[in-house]
Amino acid sequence: MAYQEPNKDGFYGKFGGRFVPETLMTAVLELEKAYRESQADPSFQEELNQLLRQYVGRETPLYYAKNLTQHIGGAKIYLKREDLNHTGAHKINNALGQVWLAKRMGKKKIIAETGAGQHGVATATAAALFNMECTIHMGEEDVKRQALNVFRMELLGAKVEAVTDGSRVLKDAVNAALRSWVANIDDTHYILGSALGPHPFPEIVRDFQSVIGREAKQQYRDLTGQNLPDALVACVGGGSNAIGLFHPFVEDESVAMYGAEAAGLGVDTEHHAATLTKGRPGVLHGSLMDVLQDAHGQILEAFSISAGLDYPGIGPEHSHYHDIKRASYVPVTDEEALEGFQLLSRVEGIIPALESSHAIAFAVKLAKELGPEKSMIVCLSGRGDKDVVQVKDRLEADAAKKGEAHA
């Protein structure tokens, strides 16, 4: 199939577009123009590639997880090690690209939102590198959950604004960042952290993250002598690491693509963030996408053990893949993610982020189904240092509950 998305209005099939007030339309049109110019300028990509190599540490390895594969006794599992990037996750691929773009546009200040803190840290890092002023909007709940990342951002010279509106999580941070952008449009660039928001943001983020899939595709051939894996697996919140892995394979129809959504306490409870499992189309943050909403169209609260996945929408390109059945999106509960977190740590000596642990948990199930003749690439989107204290507290609390039950 020839895949040519988005169209000129930023639609991926029936999803996407730019649903923004007039005050923001000028800024998104200016951004699109600057991005098109940078795409046509070989020096932009050359400079970015050099930074990705020398500063970020790309390319990241494609690692055959032999112990995990043998432990499961199913399909071969290859991990795309985005956890080994500078700052510890895939977020730097996009942050660096967008700060470099903003610098070329003559902007002086950078604003961003963050959930788990990884995009905030990546943006603060890139802003420090390019000597730009940086403000990060972060939900008050996430500020508490991710105190270490808050300190890292401040250490890097960024100002962290705790958002006290709404449920004080990622979607509220996006709202606050958009408001700030409207008020400071002339000298400020807003760096969206996921493949969300009004066009051209989903396309820009996808393009900067597609380095993941491009590298993985070539590395798989070099490692195995085979053309393509049978499946790809990535966790999905807004969906930037997943779209970065999936997009370079989208026309390879023999490759199945799976996004692992946060099912929280279960998709039949009110505590989850499984947007494609339980949501329906709606407009959120300037884009038409699948959204968790009630019967009256009010946005529901998303819930996940992982701060980076509790977003009530999903990038429009993922909604499109789901709609045309090019990718499958599967729910993974908090409990399953915790098992994945511990399993990978124990058998491979790699502590994954809680976000990535959702992908690991589903990969374990899929490997058993596919059997030993097949193979898959799993995006290990980030490292778990930021989550170790939270997991420790959770496991200790669970153990105490079990103890009480047996008493």
From Swiss-Prot:
**What GO MF annotations does this protein's record show?**
tryptophan synthase activity
Which protein are we looking at? Tryptophan synthase beta chain
The record's GO CC annotations read: cytoplasm
Per its database record, what is this protein's job?
Answer: The beta subunit is responsible for the synthesis of L-tryptophan from indole and L-serine.
The record's InterPro entries line, in alphabetical order, gives:
Trp_synth_b_CS (IPR006653), Trp_synth_beta (IPR006654), Trp_synth_beta/beta-like (IPR023026), TrpB-like_PALP (IPR001926), TrpB-like_PALP_sf (IPR036052)
Kindly list the positions at which N6-(pyridoxal phosphate)lysine occurs in this protein.
K91
> According to its UniProt record, which protein family does this protein belong to?
Belongs to the TrpB family.
Alphabetical UniProt keywords:
Amino-acid biosynthesis, Aromatic amino acid biosynthesis, Lyase, Pyridoxal phosphate, Tryptophan biosynthesis
CDD domains linked to this entry: Trp-synth_B
According to its UniProt record, which cofactors does this protein need?
pyridoxal 5'-phosphate
